[in-house]
């Protein structure tokens, strides 16, 4: 999109409206706009250099109250009692966490550390506190910042130099993104989740299909999703190559935010909702690209390869390189099959799994835990499988325990852990060993993502739970 016009007669998309309302200075010609940033989220991995840059330049944070930090990437998910640094065995991880604590204290940034009830994965902490709100611009040194777009926010990941720039100025210099509408018609079938939906979208448009765009997810199937399910969809927009993903705010959004710690109250709440209701895309507004997908045709979906676009319905077989039209795709398939140790023609349901990981900023919220617990209730996981359940935040962990979900997981034979990024990425003790095959509710299945030589299949919480019981990739329907 070009910089949105402010004329009342203009027909604007959701993304264009949010952009318009944050332009501090509009660039001339091909020059970027200067955009105000409402909220910057921080964690221990991508913030140290930014804080150092401020310190070396003798600067302070321009708006410390518009920053929110938590510890998530490097924290262990077992053996945590009081949040002491001594509970982190790895020296590099411990140093990064310690550095974040010192930086937040020095620069006046609100931090939720290990052992804090409000600690968790950064993309859960913002929503659960009510800090994430419609119409905001939100950034973080993390690609899955797109999660917050589920609330109608313009949320995207940035690099460390940009993190420092936001700290110093609370602005970013950016050219407007292109806009894409993905219309998901119909209703999702029973047993089909938001994770199946977004994996199907990525398989349809490819990992570069959304490059340079903000994707707005629209249609009946999207409107009927819960807030947590919407977060799952927007979370993986980056895996489709997009800069951000957004869903228009509605009553579902407002109901989720209302009453949370950082949400507006009283007249401020009424004023906020009145503004939020102006944000949905105008009738007649034009997107740079539009795609329509039949939501009712989506079935349980998984990945077979080493990028999120290499996915198929669970009912399929492992593809052959010859199934792909282009030479580059054939080579990519050959490489993926070799790394994953798969033989073309093998039914996906016959693939044996060693580990099941239910966690990450994609799928470790209450909806996800309830779905998995309902499937595991009264059942046991296969003897050949280890299952780790890692809630997305300490608040989610406590809520799940209040509902008795932890007991269901433990009685089924799963490990119930404390909050953190965990096995989503190989930056903490939770890792796969070489050749170990995992059904994971996370967002990336790159080579070595979950540990050197580890093999990852991206799945929904429902498929994860069924797979843990069967010992092979499975959906709940396979348990009947």
From Swiss-Prot:
Gene Ontology MF: a single term: 3-isopropylmalate dehydratase activity
Assigned EC number: 4.2.1.33
Keywords: 4Fe-4S, Amino-acid biosynthesis, Branched-chain amino acid biosynthesis, Iron, Iron-sulfur, Leucine biosynthesis, Lyase, Metal-binding
InterPro entries: 3-IsopropMal_deHydase_lsu (IPR004430), Acnase/IPM_dHydase_lsu_aba_1/3 (IPR015931), Acoase/IPM_deHydtase_lsu_aba (IPR001030), Aconitase_4Fe-4S_BS (IPR018136), Aconitase_4Fe-4S_dom (IPR036008), IPM_dehydratase_rel_enz (IPR050067), IPMI_cat (IPR033941)
Binding sites annotated in the UniProt record for [4Fe-4S] cluster: 361, 421, 424
The keyword Metal-binding belongs to this UniProt entry's keyword annotation: yes
EC class name: lyase
NCBIfam families noted in UniProt: leuC, PRK05478.1, PRK12466.1
Matching PANTHER family: 3-ISOPROPYLMALATE DEHYDRATASE (PTHR43822:SF9), HOMOACONITASE, MITOCHONDRIAL-RELATED (PTHR43822)
Subunit-structure text: Heterodimer of LeuC and LeuD.
Stated role: Catalyzes the isomerization between 2-isopropylmalate and 3-isopropylmalate, via the formation of 2-isopropylmaleate.
Entry's family note: Belongs to the aconitase/IPM isomerase family. LeuC type 1 subfamily.
Protein name from the UniProt record: 3-isopropylmalate dehydratase large subunit
Organism: Corynebacterium diphtheriae (strain ATCC 700971 / NCTC 13129 / Biotype gravis)
Classification lineage: Bacteria, Bacillati, Actinomycetota, Actinomycetes, Mycobacteriales
Gene coding for it: leuC
């Amino acid at each position: 999109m070009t910089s949105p016009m402010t004329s009342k007669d203009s027909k604007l998309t959701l993304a264009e409206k949010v952009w318009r309302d944050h332009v501090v200075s509009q660039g001339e010609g091909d020059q970027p706009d200067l955009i105000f940033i409402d909220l910057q989220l921080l964690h221990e991995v991508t913030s140290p250099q930014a804080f150092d840059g401020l310190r070396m330049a003798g600067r302070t944070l321009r708006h410390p109250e518009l920053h929110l930090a938590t510890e998530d990437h490097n924290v262990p998910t077992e053996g945590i009692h009081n949040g002491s640094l001594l509970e982190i065995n790895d020296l590099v991880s411990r140093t990064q966490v310690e550095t974040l604590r010192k930086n937040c204290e020095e620069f006046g940034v609100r931090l939720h550390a290990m052992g804090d009830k409000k600690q968790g994965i950064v993309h859960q902490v913002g929503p659960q506190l009510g800090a994430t709100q419609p119409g905001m611009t939100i950034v973080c040194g993390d690609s899955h910042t797109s999660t917050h777009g589920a609330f109608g926010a313009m949320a995207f990941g940035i690099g460390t130099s940009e993190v420092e720039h936001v700290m110093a100025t609370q602005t970013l210099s950016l050219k407007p993104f292109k806009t894409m509408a993905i219309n998901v018609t119909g209703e999702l079938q029973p047993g089909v989740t938001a994770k199946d939906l977004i994996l199907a979208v990525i398989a349809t448009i490819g990992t570069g299909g959304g490059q340079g765009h903000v994707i707005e997810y629209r249609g009946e199937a999207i409107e009927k999703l819960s807030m947590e399910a919407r977060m799952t969809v927007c979370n993986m927009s980056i895996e489709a190559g997009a800069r951000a993903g957004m869903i228009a705010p509605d009553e579902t959004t407002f109901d989720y935010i209302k009453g949370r710690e950082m949400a507006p109250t009283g007249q401020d709440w009424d004023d906020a909702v009145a503004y939020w209701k102006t944000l949905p895309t105008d009738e007649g507004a034009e997107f740079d690209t539009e795609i329509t997908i039949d939501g009712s045709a989506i079935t349980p979906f998984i990945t077979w390869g080493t990028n999120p676009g290499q996915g198929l319905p669970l009912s399929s077989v492992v593809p052959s390189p010859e199934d792909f039209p282009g030479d580059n795709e054939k080579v990519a398939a050959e490489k993926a099959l070799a790394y994953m140790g798969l033989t073309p023609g093998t039914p996906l349901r016959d693939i044996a799994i060693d580990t099941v990981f239910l966690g990450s900023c994609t799928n470790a919220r209450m909806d996800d835990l309830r779905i998995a617990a309902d499937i595991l209730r009264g059942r046991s996981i296969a003897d050949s499988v280890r299952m780790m359940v890692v809630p997305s935040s300490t608040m989610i962990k406590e809520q799940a325990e209040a509902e008795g979900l932890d007991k269901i997981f433990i009685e089924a034979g799963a490990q119930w852990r404390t909050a953190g990024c965990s096995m989503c990425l190989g930056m903490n003790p939770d890792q796969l060993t070489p050749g170990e095959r995992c059904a994971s509710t996370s967002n990336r299945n790159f080579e070595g993502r979950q540990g050197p030589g580890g093999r990852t299949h991206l799945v929904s919480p429902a498929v994860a739970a069924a797979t843990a019981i069967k010992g092979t990739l499975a959906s709940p329907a396979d348990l009947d």
